[in-house]
Regions:
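Conserved, mostly hydrophobic/aromatic
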Residues: 19, 52, 61, 86, ...
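A structural signal for short coil/turn segments at secondary-structure junctions
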Residues: 2, 26-27, 56, 121, ...
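N-terminal cationic-hydrophobic initiation segments that often serve targeting/anchoring roles
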Residues: 23-27, 53, 118, 143, ...
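Active-site gating/metal-coordination segments in enzymes
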Residues: 5-6, 13-101, 105
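Mid-to-C-terminal alpha-helical segments outside catalytic/metal-binding sites
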Residues: 1-6, 173-179, 187-220
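Flexible loop residues that form catalytic
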Residues: 12, 66, 131-132, 156, ...
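Catalytic pocket-lining loop regions of alpha/beta-barrel enzymes
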Residues: 59-60, 73-179
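Active-site phosphate/pyrophosphate- and oxyanion-stabilizing loops and adjacent acidic/basic residues
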Residues: 17-21, 50, 115-116, 140, ...
Length: 220
């Protein structure tokens, strides 16, 4: 009904096993990302990545360390072996950086985190969920300097402070690394697709809505 053919699905509220089953059952409709947990040991997280992303059908990992039972920052040195492995395997790394992202809502969303990670791991394409909001100018600056950062602000590009900055970036320098996110179920699918059509120029609309994600996740 909303014209959405393919969706990105991190395993936020379901297990990696169930996400894998969903991706395989609805083949071609969902791009899955394996979730890891900062409360796990490094070995446990590496095993998850190997099982579900390297040897399985999931396209990368999704990480929300601020939401864990052991809240940490994504640039904690503890996680560097995980990132090293993802870089070796050519996996996309998605990090929740924005919105309600940990006990300290400002510090856990600080774009200084991804700026450091993008510099330390230039071989990783970093996928920033929630677009680094509310640090809009700062995250866009990080994207300007680091071409391995991709963002999708989802609901934060609709009627939130800084929304126009996202839209200007998508229609300009960031048009090849900016992706649409519906914000569903917080926002209705049909309405967000309709509003996105009004936000983006004809030259970049297809990129933002599909082509950029297809390139990032190597979809054929």
């Amino acid at each position: 009904e909303a014209g959405i053919a393919v969706g990105i699905a991190p395993s936020r509220f379901i297990s990696n096993e169930h996400l894998t089953e969903m991706v395989e059952h609805f083949r071609g409709r969902f791009v899955g990302m394996a979730s890891i947990d900062s409360a796990n040991s490094i070995r446990e997280n590496l095993d998850i990545i190997r099982t579900y992303a390297v040897d399985g059908p999931l396209k990368g990992i999704h990480f929300e360390p601020g939401h864990s039972s052991l809240p940490l920052y994504a640039d904690d040195p503890k996680f560097y072996p995980i990132y090293e492995y993802c870089q070796e395997q050519g996996l996309v790394v998605g990090i929740m950086l924005g919105g309600n992202n940990g006990p300290n809502l400002i510090n856990h969303t600080n774009p200084a985190i991804i700026t450091q990670l993008a510099a330390d791991f230039p071989g990783i394409n970093w996928f920033i969920c929630h677009g680094g909001w509310p640090w809009v100018t700062e995250i866009l600056g990080a994207c300007f300097w680091h071409e391995n950062i991709w963002i999708e602000p989802d609901l934060y590009m609709f009627n939130c402070p800084g929304a126009q900055e996202y839209i200007n970036a998508a229609n300009g320098f960031l048009q090849d690394r900016f992706m649409f996110g519906s914000g569903y179920p917080l926002l209705p699918l049909g309405e967000t697709v309709k509003r996105a059509r009004e936000m983006f120029s004809d030259a970049v609309y297809d990129k933002v809505m599909y082509k950029n994600a297809a390139e990032l996740f190597n979809l054929t």
